[in-house]
């Protein structure tokens, strides 16, 4: 493996990626570009080895399945600076580099007396990845608190600042997901309130708070409740390879949901993000099809949570993908519902 090091960036050849994805599958990058200073990005991207190559951005690799070696160059941002850049009477603007660990940012915001991100505690990944999927959990989504996304626009070869509206944030969606070849996120600014109405819609959070003796909850209490719940339900990717929830919860027209409930009266249904749509529980669908806790070789579904696909050791990305496809097919055959993966599939088509 040969390396090229310049001010603010480093380029490595034939770099192993097992440590850079939370499924811990084996894959190799033809080129791995590590950027420490975003200002150096245009120069780094112009390096002759990668100038015309496809580009894959990896944060902590917590939302990808490497079903094969990625083509071209893998880019990792190593800028991990976090700071409050503006104080106001009732809120503050926090800026975090793309390489900052997401959970570390949540804890930082709470330490600064800021709220809003507490329901999103312990989600794996980096700040740079959070707007792409508009990450969400327990009734909250990050898009509600994004002020500005700072990115490098590859089409116009310039740095840009996109406000929340320009980011086109939707359910697990954004302009960055819709145009993956255009924007490289280098930092995110968050508008975080000093006091925020706590999101306690999920019964599990209320029950956890009660068990903690925190009926009059603060944001930090909600974060701890979420941490407790996630640690019980979701395997630690450092111990057992996984990418958290593998499938999206399906959004369907209310008419289709009513028809399903006529046949499956115990099917749980939740409000959708838009009028006329409801949301089904992908975990419930998968469990009803008998996949929860099932294992084939080193590929399997967590016995604690039916949404979590796991690598018990040496499963390849291709094996995990095949396993996931068969789960989705069984749900389609039984319920006529299409499951879509949350992680980005690299090296193969879904």
From Swiss-Prot:
PROSITE patterns listed in its UniProt record: FAD_PCMH
UniProt cross-references to Gene3D superfamilies, sorted A to Z: 3.30.465.10, UDP-N-acetylenolpyruvoylglucosamine reductase, C-terminal domain (3.90.78.10), Uridine Diphospho-n-acetylenolpyruvylglucosamine Reductase, domain 2 (3.30.43.10)
Active site positions: 172, 245, 342
Cofactor(s) annotated in UniProt: FAD
Biological or metabolic pathway of the protein: Cell wall biogenesis; peptidoglycan biosynthesis
Database matches in InterPro entries: FAD-bd_PCMH, FAD-bd_PCMH-like_sf, FAD-bd_PCMH_sub1, FAD-bd_PCMH_sub2, MurB, MurB_C, MurB_C_sf, Oxid_FAD_bind_N
EC number assigned by the record: 1.3.1.98
GO biological process entries: cell division; cell wall organization; peptidoglycan biosynthetic process; regulation of cell shape
Reaction(s) catalysed by this chain's protein: UDP-N-acetyl-alpha-D-muramate + NADP(+) = UDP-N-acetyl-3-O-(1-carboxyvinyl)-alpha-D-glucosamine + NADPH + H(+)
One GO MF term: UDP-N-acetylmuramate dehydrogenase activity
Keyword Cell cycle tagged: yes
Compartments reported by the entry: Cytoplasm
Record's keyword annotation contains Kinase: no
GO annotation, cellular component aspect: cytosol
Keywords recorded for this protein, A-Z: Cell cycle, Cell division, Cell shape, Cell wall biogenesis/degradation, Cytoplasm, FAD, Flavoprotein, NADP, Oxidoreductase, Peptidoglycan synthesis
Domain FAD-binding PCMH-type as annotated: residue spans: 24-195
NCBIfam families per record: murB, PRK00046.1, PRK13903.1
Protein name as it appears in the record: UDP-N-acetylenolpyruvoylglucosamine reductase
């Amino acid at each position: 493996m040969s390396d090229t090091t310049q001010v603010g960036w480093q380029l490595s050849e034939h770099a192993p990626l097992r440590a850079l994805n939370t499924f811990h599958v084996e894959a190799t990058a033809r080129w791995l570009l590590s950027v420490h200073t975003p200002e150096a990005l245009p120069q780094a991207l112009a390096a002759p080895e990668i100038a015309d190559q496809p580009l894959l951005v990896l944060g902590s690799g917590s939302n990808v399945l490497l079903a094969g070696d990625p083509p071209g160059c893998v880019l990792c941002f190593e800028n991990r600076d976090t700071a409050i850049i503006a104080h106001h009477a009732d809120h503050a603007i926090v800026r975090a580099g793309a390489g900052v660990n997401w959970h570390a940012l949540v804890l930082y915001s709470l330490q600064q007396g800021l709220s809003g991100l507490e329901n999103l505690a312990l989600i794996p990944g980096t700040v740079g990845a959070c707007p792409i999927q508009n990450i969400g959990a327990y009734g909250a989504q990050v898009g509600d608190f994004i002020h500005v996304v700072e990115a490098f626009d590859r089409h116009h070869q310039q740095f840009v600042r996109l406000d929340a509206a320009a980011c086109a944030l939707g359910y697990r969606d954004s302009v960055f997901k819709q145009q993956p070849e255009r924007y490289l996120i280098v930092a995110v600014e968050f508008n975080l309130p000093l006091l925020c109405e706590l999101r306690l819609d999920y019964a599990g959070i209320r029950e956890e708070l009660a068990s903690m003796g925190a009926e009059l909850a603060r944001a930090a209490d909600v974060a701890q409740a979420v941490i407790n719940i996630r640690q019980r339900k979701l395997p630690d990717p450092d111990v057992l390879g996984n990418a958290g929830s593998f499938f999206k919860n399906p959004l369907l027209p209310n008419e289709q949901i009513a028809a399903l409930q006529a046949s499956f009266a115990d099917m749980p249904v939740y409000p959708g993000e838009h009028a006329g749509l409801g949301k089904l529980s992908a975990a419930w669908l998968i469990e009803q099809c008998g996949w929860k806790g099932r294992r084939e070789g080193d590929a399997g579904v967590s016995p604690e949570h039916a949404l979590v696909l796991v690598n018990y050791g040496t499963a390849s990305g291709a094996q995990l993908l095949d396993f996931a496809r068969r789960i989705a097919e069984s749900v389609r055959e039984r319920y006529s519902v299409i499951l879509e993966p949350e992680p980005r599939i690299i090296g193969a088509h879904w």
